[in-house]
Amino acid sequence: MKYIAYAFELTHRPDELTLETAYDLLSAELAEIGFESFEQNETCLRAYIPVSTDIASDIPALLEQFPLPGLLWQYSSEIQPDINWNEQWEKNFFRPIRIEDKCLVRAPFHPTDPDIPLELIISPQMAFGTGHHETTSLMMSYLLDMDLRGLRVLDMGCGTGILAILARKLGASSVTAIDIDDWCIRNTGENAALNDIRDIDVRIGDASLLADCPMFDLIIANINRNILLDDMSAYRSRLGNGGTLLLSGFYTEDIPILTECAEILGLTLSETRSRNNWAALRFTPDSPKR
C-alpha cells in the first residue's frame, strides 16, 4: 500500500509546552481523521496516511482548531513507496515499553526480559495501541492494578488488541473486542496469536453491536471524547451491577463533560489518572435504590 507522508513542524509554541507533548497531541488529532502511523524526531512529526484516504483539505482546519492555543505549524507532504513497518519500528520505536515494571510490551524482534513477570508481543504496525501512547499505558496501568480473574470483558475500539490481550492474560474468563476498522480486526487476531491467545471474540462494527451482546463485568473504551459521549449509554446498558467502566482517549479538560454524561447514566467516577494532559477515568454503577 502506498502512503502519503506529511511532515509537521512546530514553528512557535509556549515555553511551558514541550515539543514531545505538542507532537503527541497532534498525533491523536491526526489519528482521528485517518492517519495510521507517526514518527517523531527533533525537527518534525511525520504522519502517514494511505493515498486512497488522503484528506489534505481537512488539515488546515484541524491545525486552526488545535485544542492548545499559541501554536503555529507548517507542513509538507510527499508520496511514499510501500512502507516496511518492521524497519520503521526498529528505527523509531526500538525500545520495549515497561508498564510499572509489571508488564513488558515488545515487538517480535525485541528480546524478552526475565525480570518482568508479564509480556505482550505486538506486531509492528503503528504507534498507537503499543503502550507508547499515554492513553494506552494509562489503561494498561488500570488493568494491571485490578483482579480480572473470571471477569467478562469488553474492549471497544480495540485497535491492535493490546488491552483485550492483556485482559485475557490477566485471567478474564471471556474477552470481546470490537472495532470499526477491518485492519484493526486483522491486527488484533494476529497479535492475539503472537501471544498464544486464540479465544478472543473479535468483531467488526460499532456500539450498535452491543444490543446483541451479553452483560460484561468490565468495559474498556480507549477511543475519543465525541465517540465516548455518543456511545456511553450503550456501554452502560451492557455493564453489570458491580462492574467497571474504563474510559480514555481524551484530554484532562474533557473530564467534566464525560463525568457529567456518566452521572446522568447512573455511573460514579471512582478514580482519575492522567499523564501529559491525557486522562483515563474509572466509573462504577450507582448502587440500586431499595
UniProtKB/Swiss-Prot annotation:
Q: Which reaction does it catalyse?
A: L-lysyl-[protein] + 3 S-adenosyl-L-methionine = N(6),N(6),N(6)-trimethyl-L-lysyl-[protein] + 3 S-adenosyl-L-homocysteine + 3 H(+)
Q: Which GO terms describe its cellular component?
A: cytoplasm
Write the Enzyme Commission number(s) for this entry: 2.1.1.-
List the GO biological process terms: methylation
**Membrane among keywords:** no
Q: Which domain of life is it from?
A: Bacteria
What InterPro entries does this protein map onto?
Answer: Ribosomal_L11_MeTrfase_PrmA, Ribosomal_PrmA_MeTrfase, SAM-dependent_MTases_sf
Question: Principal place where this protein is found?
Answer: cytoplasm
**Gene Ontology terms for molecular function:** protein-lysine N-methyltransferase activity
Query: For S-adenosyl-L-methionine, which residues are the binding ones?
Result: T136, G157, D179, N222
Methyltransferase as UniProt keyword: yes
Subcellular location, record wording: Cytoplasm
What keywords are assigned to this protein? Cytoplasm, Methyltransferase, S-adenosyl-L-methionine, Transferase
* Broad EC category: transferase
Q: By its UniProt entry, which NCBIfam families does this protein fall under?
A: PRK00517.2-2 (NF001785)
Q: Name the PANTHER family for this protein.
A: ELECTRON TRANSFER FLAVOPROTEIN BETA SUBUNIT LYSINE METHYLTRANSFERASE
Q: What does this protein do?
A: Methylates ribosomal protein L11.
Q: Its family?
A: Belongs to the methyltransferase superfamily. PrmA family.
Please identify the protein, giving its name as recorded. Ribosomal protein L11 methyltransferase
Q: Record the organism.
A: Porphyromonas gingivalis (strain ATCC BAA-308 / W83)
Designated gene of the protein: prmA
